[in-house]
């Protein structure tokens, strides 16, 4: 080994030892008769002292920041008053006798711990990863995966790998396709998840499976998504919903306790999908901001205000939420901004009032009685603001108000977004209508067990034995009890409009397995990238992935995706169309 110790290892107890350290030159300071180098590696930092009479002193003239060096020297206690309490090695320094330059660095585009634009950080990711922030995040990620593996091992789970080259079964996002050279015109697909394989493992008798696995989705990348991502994939046989939730809570609690020393209260809260939509306008609620949506129809019974009256006559709803102590921010200009945002979200407009010494609102002339009713019933206090909207589509109304609630919360109440709000969302509808495909699609996936009493021909009434875990408004995991009866699986395919021959073409190998003994089973998949980002306090998953893609799926470091050699395309019998 070139080194005897790391840069974060030496302590006062090592005083007098001859040591060799290797690392990057973080900083150089010249105080005349003595020169100091802060030497850094992933373990920490050590101060190197180069006295004027040493060979090491002369070598410093050749050094540049971020050069990689080997230092030989002796450990000594720092003089009293010069200790650095901010680093683990702050009580000692190494008096250098020799410095060997292993790799001299040219001037860098930026230096670790600087914060250039993200494009620059991604282009030179190997420099960015030297920063303390990124180093801590990557180490945290490793520690979390280590805890997860240990947890499942203790419970008797087996970590089993599943194929990356598999069959395309397009449901939901597009597959990444891989052409086969040996079978021209045929394609593999990279897995969007190991869903079918983990169910086949249950059918194979491996009753407790987990895997930390890469997954791939060729989708239009929304904010903070990646085309390749990592799941903690879990499946169990002979279980019900309570079993899966209990094991999942144990994993999350263990991760928080061992990774960041935080004890979580279990079991976690649970709310139904319906309750989440009614109170928060989303199935991924962040409850830390408060401001629950409220049904305000009672205040508008018999109203003469035409806009709301017409909505109510059509069977629509009136809802709103209270923003506490927001009156000083709620100017006419702010009201106009929120009005425009409400229209962007599909609402006809927005009504608002604030409580000061009296009620203030541009709508007061027409709605004073209604506002006073709301103030009394909802116990509004001076300084509170109430935002109100009406629409005949209750789902749209909930979602639009939920978005406004969250945007106001993040902009004005970020001080409330402390800690971790963890809950389960349960009792999902099985199907949702896809405007793009003009048909009902499975909200989770078509292998989810329905609540059998609800399984009929009316898509809107079918419930799923599905569950999502949400932390701070992000879906961190989702799963379900799976179908283990062939007739139910065929019924679901039929409700999805999938013909028998189409189902056989896509899932024949899977349906064949249903003939030969399928245990009741269920599972869950956690998004590791998102879980780590939340625990690290990062807003973007790119901050916890060593080599992420940009928002449009490009690797700025390598230039992927890129053109390939014409010979490779000919071997695959692929022709690229221009434009």
Swiss-Prot record:
EC number: 6.1.1.23
Entry's localization field: Cytoplasm
GO biological process: aspartyl-tRNA aminoacylation
Superkingdom in the source lineage: Bacteria
UniProt keyword annotations, A-Z: Aminoacyl-tRNA synthetase, ATP-binding, Cytoplasm, Ligase, Nucleotide-binding, Protein biosynthesis
Site positions (Important for tRNA non-discrimination): 81
Substrates-to-products reaction catalysed: tRNA(Asx) + L-aspartate + ATP = L-aspartyl-tRNA(Asx) + AMP + diphosphate
Gene3D superfamilies: Bira Bifunctional Protein, Domain 2 (3.30.930.10), GAD-like domain (3.30.1360.30), Nucleic acid-binding proteins (2.40.50.140)
Chain positions recorded as ATP binding sites: 217-219, 226, 475, 527-530
Region span, Aspartate: 195-198
Pfam families listed in its UniProt record: GAD (PF02938), tRNA-synt_2 (PF00152), tRNA_anti-codon (PF01336)
Residues bound to L-aspartate: 171, 217, 444, 482
InterPro entries documented for this protein: Aa-tRNA-synt_II, aa-tRNA-synth_II, aa-tRNA-synth_II/BPL/LPL, Asp-tRNA-ligase_1, Asp-tRNA-ligase_1_N, Asp/Asn-tRNA-synth_IIb, AspRS_core, GAD-like_sf
Gene Ontology CC terms: cytoplasm
GO molecular function, one term: nucleic acid binding
Family in the record: Belongs to the class-II aminoacyl-tRNA synthetase family. Type 1 subfamily.
Self-association state and partner proteins as the record states: Homodimer.
HAMAP family: Asp_tRNA_synth_type1
PANTHER family: ASPARTATE--TRNA LIGASE, MITOCHONDRIAL, ASPARTYL/LYSYL-TRNA SYNTHETASE
Protein task: Aspartyl-tRNA synthetase with relaxed tRNA specificity since it is able to aspartylate not only its cognate tRNA(Asp) but also tRNA(Asn). Reaction proceeds in two steps: L-aspartate is first activated by ATP to form Asp-AMP and then transferred to the acceptor end of tRNA(Asp/Asn).
Protein's recorded name: Aspartate--tRNA(Asp/Asn) ligase
Species assigned in the record: Thermotoga neapolitana (strain ATCC 49049 / DSM 4359 / NBRC 107923 / NS-E)
UniProt gene name: aspS
């Amino acid at each position: 080994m070139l080194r005897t110790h790391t840069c974060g290892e030496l302590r006062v107890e090592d005083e007098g030892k001859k040591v060799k350290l290797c690392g990057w030159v973080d900083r150089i300071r010249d105080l005349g008769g003595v020169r100091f180098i802060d030497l850094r590696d992933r373990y920490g930092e050590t101060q190197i002292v180069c006295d004027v009479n040493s060979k090491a002193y002369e070598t410093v003239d050749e050094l540049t920041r971020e050069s990689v060096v080997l230092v030989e020297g002796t450990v000594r206690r720092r003089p009293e008053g010069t200790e650095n309490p901010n680093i683990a090695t702050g009580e000692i320094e190494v008096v250098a006798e020799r410095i060997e330059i292993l790799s001299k660095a040219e001037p860098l585009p930026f230096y670790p711990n600087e914060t250039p634009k993200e494009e620059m950080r991604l282009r030179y990711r190997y420099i960015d990863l030297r920063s303390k922030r990124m180093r801590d995040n990557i180490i945290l990620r490793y520690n979390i995966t280590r805890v997860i593996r240990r947890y499942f091992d203790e419970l008797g789970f087996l970590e089993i790998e599943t194929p990356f080259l598999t069959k395309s079964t397009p449901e939901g996002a597009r597959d990444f396709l891989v052409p086969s050279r040996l079978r021209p015109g045929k394609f593999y697909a990279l897995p969007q998840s190991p869903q079918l394989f983990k169910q086949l493992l249950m059918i194979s008798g491996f009753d407790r499976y987990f895997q930390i696995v890469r997954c791939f989705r060729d989708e239009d990348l929304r904010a903070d998504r990646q085309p390749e991502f990592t799941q903690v994939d879990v499946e169990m046989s002979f279980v019900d919903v309570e079993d899966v939730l209990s094991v999942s809570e144990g994993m999350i609690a263990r991760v928080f306790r061992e990774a960041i020393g935080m004890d979580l209260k279990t079991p976690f809260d649970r709310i139904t999908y319906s309750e989440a939509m009614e109170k928060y306008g989303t199935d991924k609620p962040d409850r830390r901001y408060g401001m629950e949506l409220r049904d305000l129809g009672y205040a508008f019974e018999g109203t003469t205000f035409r806009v709301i009256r017409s909505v109510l006559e059509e069977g629509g709803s009136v809802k709103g939420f209270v923003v506490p102590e927001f009156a000083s921010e709620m100017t006419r200009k702010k009201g106009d901004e929120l009005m425009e945002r409400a229209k962007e979200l599909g609402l006809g407009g927005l009504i608002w009032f604030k409580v000061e010494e009296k009620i203030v609102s541009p709508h007061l002339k027409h709605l004073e009685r209604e506002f006073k009713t709301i103030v009394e019933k909802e116990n509004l206090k001076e300084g509170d603001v109430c935002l109100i909207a009406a629409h005949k589509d209750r789902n749209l109304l909930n979602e639009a108000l939920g978005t406004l609630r969250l945007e106001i919360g993040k902009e004005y109440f970020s001080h409330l977004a402390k800690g971790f709000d963890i809950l389960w969302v349960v009792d999902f509808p099985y199907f949702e209508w896809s405007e793009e495909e003009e048909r009902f699609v499975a909200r989770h996936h078509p292998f989810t067990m329905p609540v059998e009493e609800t399984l009929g021909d009316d898509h809107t009434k079918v419930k799923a034995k599905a569950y999502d875990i949400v932390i701070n408004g992000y879906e961190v995991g989702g799963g379900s009890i799976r179908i283990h009866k062939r007739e139910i699986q065929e019924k679901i395919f039929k409700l999805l409009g999938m013909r028998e021959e189409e189902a056989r073409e896509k899932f024949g190998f899977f349906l064949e397995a249903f003939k030969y003994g399928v245990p009741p089973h269920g599972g869950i998949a956690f998004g590791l990238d998102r879980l780590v980002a939340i625990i690290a306090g990062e807003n973007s998953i790119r901050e916890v992935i060593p080599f992420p893609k940009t928002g449009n799926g490009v690797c700025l470091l390598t230039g992927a995706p890129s053109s390939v050699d014409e010979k490779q395309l000919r071997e695959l019998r692929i022709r690229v169309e221009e434009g």
